[in-house]
Curated annotation (Swiss-Prot):
The gene is yhbP. Belongs to the UPF0306 family. This is UPF0306 protein YhbP. It comes from Escherichia coli O139:H28 (strain E24377A / ETEC). It comes from the Bacteria. SUPFAM superfamilies: FMN-binding split barrel.
Length: 147
């Protein structure tokens, strides 16, 4: 549990996620501002359905991605690598996520793009501020945490 708490605190301070999707052997990555839900261990993003990554995702798809800062020194590197699933939200689920997203990013109120959820199933957090190469791993549903 401590691993997930540590990762969640760090993710709550960041705001841009990179995620990649695959369809029929073709890969594509995208970036977006995100809202992180620590209870669901999920990112919420807005992206238009006409984008290449949304078209490749369809209503639901496997994803992998990263969140990282841009430190100028190796000793300060921190970042997350993850895998999970992306899906477009509908109805009340979408409405609730959009309200929370708009609170974090008020400018998003002007956007009509659909809300998507990236549910994280595996997270590897690298935190060199705790020692070079220090990694923490969280796996959904396994009850295991590795530090």
């Amino acid at each position: 549990m401590e691993t997930l708490i540590t990762i969640s605190r760090w993710l709550a301070k960041q705001h841009v996620v990179t995620w990649c999707v695959q369809q029929e052997g073709e890969l594509w990555c995208a970036n977006a501002f995100y809202l992180f839900d620590a209870q669901k261990v999920a990112f919420y993003i807005l992206t238009e359905e006409k984008t290449r990554h949304a078209q490749m995702s369809g209503p639901q798809a496997a994803v992998a991605g990263t969140v990282n800062g841009q430190p100028k020194t190796v000793a300060l590197i921190r970042g997350v690598q993850f895998k999970g699933e992306i899906r477009r939200l509908e109805g009340e689920e979408s409405d609730l996520a959009r309200k929370a997203y708009n609170r974090r990013f008020p400018v998003a109120r002007m956007l009509s793009a659909p809300v998507w959820e990236i549910r994280l199933d595996e997270i590897k957090f690298t935190d060199n501020t705790l020692g070079f190469g220090k990694k923490m791993i969280w796996l959904r549903g396994s009850g295991t945490e590795q530090a």
